[in-house]
């Protein structure tokens, strides 16, 4: 039995050294550590965020955020992909119509350093619940007509899962008059990845500055990228 323990010890030491050697040259892990550090700094500086609710996964965050809806209005998701999250939302709100926007042609431009243009393209539309309406096309092509039709309807719940700064910017540009006090917004890629400061995060804070938006944090996922908040006031519209 002693020989087996010695053998296992040698094996574990060899394995640990191999992992350490691989990690020492792993650029992706190094970039993620930098992203985690900057994310933690942001959370520490945002005193109210650190005091908000913490969730184990994005579905817990989505469920809680939906429970905080207080106004009647549009339920919208931007970035549907295979429909996992929009179906989850639809199941929680079976009596509401959910609008899902996506080109289904993949990313319109490269995102970060490892998600190239066309990533997430689907050959067929995803299967969605009966209370889901899919709006196919680029946001800048589909939103003008949609907003014209719903110009007087507020957004009650907004799920931003479009990854890119440009796409998120387009959403806020077109929906800024529909976003009101009480609107709940959940971001799927807000922080905690390399380059997060130039993505959904940046587009949101530009909207906050442009429209003089006040908001409160609802919570975030402890080991992922998701964040939820509630608009409490808009002065600049």
Regions found by a protein language model. Give the residues of each.
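S-adenosylmethionine/decaboxylated-SAM
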Residues: 37-49, 63, 68-237
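Short, intrinsically disordered low-complexity segments
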Residues: 1-4, 8, 57, 95, ...
């Amino acid at each position: 039995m002693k020989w087996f323990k010695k053998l296992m010890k040698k094996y574990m030491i060899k394995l640990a050294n191999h992992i350490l050697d691989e990690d020492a040259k792993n650029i992706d892990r190094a970039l993620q550590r930098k992203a985690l550090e900057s994310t933690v700094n942001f959370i520490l500086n945002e005193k109210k965020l650190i005091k908000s609710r913490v969730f184990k996964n994005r579905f817990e965050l989505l469920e809680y955020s939906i429970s905080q809806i207080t106004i009647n209005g549009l339920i919208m998701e931007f970035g549907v992909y295979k429909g996992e999250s929009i179906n989850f939302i639809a199941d929680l709100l079976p009596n509401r119509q959910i609008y899902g926007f996506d080109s289904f042609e993949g990313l319109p431009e490269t995102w970060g350093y490892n998600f190239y243009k066309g990533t997430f393209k689907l050959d067929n539309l995803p299967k969605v619940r009966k209370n889901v309406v899919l709006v196919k096309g680029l946001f800048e092509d589909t939103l003008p007509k949609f907003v014209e039709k719903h110009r007087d309807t507020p957004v009650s719940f907004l799920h931003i899962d479009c990854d890119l700064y440009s796409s998120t910017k387009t959403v806020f540009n077109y929906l800024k008059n529909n976003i009101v006090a009480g609107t709940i917004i959940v971001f799927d890629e807000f922080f905690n990845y390399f380059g997060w400061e130039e993505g959904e995060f940046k587009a949101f804070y530009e909207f906050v500055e442009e429209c003089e938006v006040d908001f409160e944090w609802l919570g975030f996922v402890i080991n992922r990228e998701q964040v939820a908040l509630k608009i409490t006031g808009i002065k600049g519209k």
